[in-house]
Regions:
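Walker A (P-loop) ATP-phosphate-binding motif of ABC ATPase nucleotide-binding domains
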Residues: 6
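Hydrophobic anchor at the beta1->P-loop junction of P-loop NTPases
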Residues: 9
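P-loop (Walker A) phosphate-binding loop of NTP-binding proteins
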Residues: 12
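Conserved lysine of the Walker
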Residues: 17
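Hydrophobic positions on the alpha1 helix immediately C-terminal to the Walker A/P-loop
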Residues: 20
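ATP-dependent small-molecule kinase phosphotransfer cores
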Residues: 31-87, 93-96
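Small-molecule kinase domains that catalyze NTP-dependent phosphoryl transfer to phosphate-bearing small molecules
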Residues: 71, 102, 111-176, 181-194
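ATP-dependent NMP and nucleoside kinases share a basic, alpha-helical "lid"
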Residues: 77-125
């Protein structure tokens, strides 16, 4: 088990995971790691446009996971071993990824937004037409964690993301969370909806 403060974020596309992670990096000294980093590196070999094409990355991730299920987990694990200080993993999308994050004592956070807000943010962020946005929302990774109940925290991803990042950082720092009591709390919340609010 790794002995460092790790925050692991999950949520649908455009819920603010990357923005909140960036605030944690800039304002609170976290180191950012993403499961998708390895995908971007692979996609970049096909050309720089592919590394930023979210639909292409989602499909590449699906294909890669079907052939080498723990490839992205191993890539994150290797990066974690090289980092010192607090870490934010910004993109949990699959059950194996949340299980990995929980196994290393990460504080898991599910960001939630209404689907209408997600559609609006996708159109604004990516300039996607409605059809393209629906393809992104329909990707396998978009709903893989919908039924997970044992998040440490569930947070509505609305409002000022800088304030949400501060609440996450402050809530975790002030709660004096240790890896042992995270595991205990997870055992005690398995039967509930899961997750506290910060």
């Amino acid at each position: 088990m790794m002995l460092k403060q790790i925050v692991a974020l999950s949520g649908p596309r455009c819920c603010g995971k990357s923005t909140i992670a960036q605030h944690l990096v800039v304002n609170h000294g976290y180191i950012r790691i993403a499961f998708a980093d390895a995908l971007r590196e692979i996609a970049e070999t096909a050309g720089p446009d592919f590394a930023n094409d979210r639909l292409y990355l989602a499909r590449l991730g699906d294909k890669l996971r079907s052939q080498v299920p723990d490839f992205l987990i191993q890539a994150v694990k290797n990066r974690l071993e090289l980092t010192h200080g607090p870490v934010v993993i910004e993109d949990i999308r699959f059950p194996a990824e949340i299980e990995f994050c929980q196994s290393i004592g990460a504080t898991t956070i599910r960001l939630e937004i209404p689907i209408e807000t997600q559609r609006e943010r996708l159109a604004k962020r990516d300039g996607k037409e409605e059809h393209e946005s629906e393809l992104l929302i329909a990707c396998m990774d978009e709903h893989a964690l919908d039924d997970v109940i044992d998040w440490d925290y569930r947070i509505p991803a609305i409002g000022d993301f800088r304030e949400l990042a501060l609440a996450i950082h402050t809530g975790i720092s002030q709660s004096n969370i240790t890896q042992a009591n995270i595991q205990d709390r997870r055992k005690n919340t398995k039967s509930s909806k899961g997750g506290e609010s910060i």
